[in-house]
């Protein structure tokens, strides 16, 4: 069975640099498993590999859709399979890199086949929640108690999706999720990078500061600018995906800055407002990293490497390479798929 290497871990842990060195060592290419790096123009806030890095090693499943488009895990699977197969035909082992647990689970465990988004229904549900906060979660508890127990009340998008599935299929999403499609027919070698939580949080804070310095605010301005024109708004509405519900605009960093840019607080305290926004991005990113840890820890077949205190890409790569050679003792580097 053809092999696939998966290098996973929480945001900011150190996957990107190490994965590029690993891809060079194995003479292969990288496939992104990041649900936000798929969007064009969202470079800084999603920490995409740099142009130089992508010239050194070819990356797939990055910059494939516009921010105004909707994208599902089902579509990801449909589009990633041909990429994987083409690499296998070339005698290469794909390296899948990312932190989107749902994408990785869909490949390795399978996915449930749910209905497509019903934007009119979502708008109606959103309106109900705006009228009475907490009403949707209570509704979900009635429709599907099991699903409600696994979703945080504040996670409005997941609450709405669970209700949507219940209403469209007449079945609870918790039941449908038990009827998974088959996993992709490959041998998956999962290597996870982890480090001390406090250390990771410090890295995240520093990275957010770097993103702001690199121009994240202007990047968000450029992204939302087209939607300030009535024609673009009308076209988006016609397509059935309200701007505030676009998946791309739910990305951490983008959502907070978009809110910051739309705020009417006087410019006298503009700098203070930006600092509050930056703090919010840091807090939300750390919470996301915590959720990623929780998600990945449920997977029993991940081979974890603790890289606490290790910051250099070369050192992280060497640890990953050692793990790979231990898992495949009869194979080395370029011949690992033999």
Provide a role label for each language-model segment.
Residues 1-338:
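Phosphate/pyrophosphate-binding catalytic cores of soluble transferases and nucleic-acid-acting enzymes
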């Amino acid at each position: 069975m053809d092999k696939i290497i998966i290098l996973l871990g929480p945001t900011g842990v150190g996957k990107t640099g190490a994965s590029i060195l690993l891809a060079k060592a194995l003479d292969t290419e990288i496939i992104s498993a990041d649900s936000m790096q798929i969007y064009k123009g969202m470079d800084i806030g999603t920490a995409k590999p740099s142009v130089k890095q992508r010239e050194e090693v070819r990356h797939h499943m990055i910059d494939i859709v516009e921010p105004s488009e909707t994208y599902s895990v089902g579509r990801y699977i449909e589009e990633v399979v041909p990429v994987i197969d083409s690499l296998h035909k070339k005698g290469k082992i794909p390296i899948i890199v990312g932190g989107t647990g749902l994408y990785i689970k869909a490949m390795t465990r399978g996915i449930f086949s749910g209905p497509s988004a019903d934007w009119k229904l979502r708008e109606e549900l959103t309106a109900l929640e705006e009228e009475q906060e907490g009403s949707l979660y209570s509704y979900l508890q009635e429709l599907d108690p099991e699903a409600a127990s696994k979703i945080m009340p504040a996670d409005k998008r997941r609450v709405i999706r669970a209700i949507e599935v219940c209403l469209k299929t007449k079945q609870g999403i918790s039941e449908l999720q038990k009827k998974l499609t088959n996993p992709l027919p490959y041998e998956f070698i999962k290597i996870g990078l982890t480090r001390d939580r406090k250390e990771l949080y410090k890295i995240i804070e520093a990275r957010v500061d770097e993103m702001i310095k690199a121009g994240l605010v202007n990047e968000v301005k450029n992204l939302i600018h087209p939607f300030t024109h009535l024609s673009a708004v009308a076209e988006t509405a016609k397509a059935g995906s309200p701007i505030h519900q676009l998946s791309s605009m739910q990305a951490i960093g983008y959502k907070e800055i978009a809110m910051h840019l739309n705020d009417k607080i006087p410019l006298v305290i503009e700098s203070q407002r930006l600092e509050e926004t930056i703090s919010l991005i840091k807090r939300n990113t750390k919470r996301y990293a915590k959720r990623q840890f929780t998600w990945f820890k449920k997977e029993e077949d991940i081979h974890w490497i603790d890289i606490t205190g290790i910051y250099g890409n070369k050192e992280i790569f060497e640890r990953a390479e050692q793990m790979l050679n231990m898992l495949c003792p009869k194979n080395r580097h370029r011949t690992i798929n033999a």
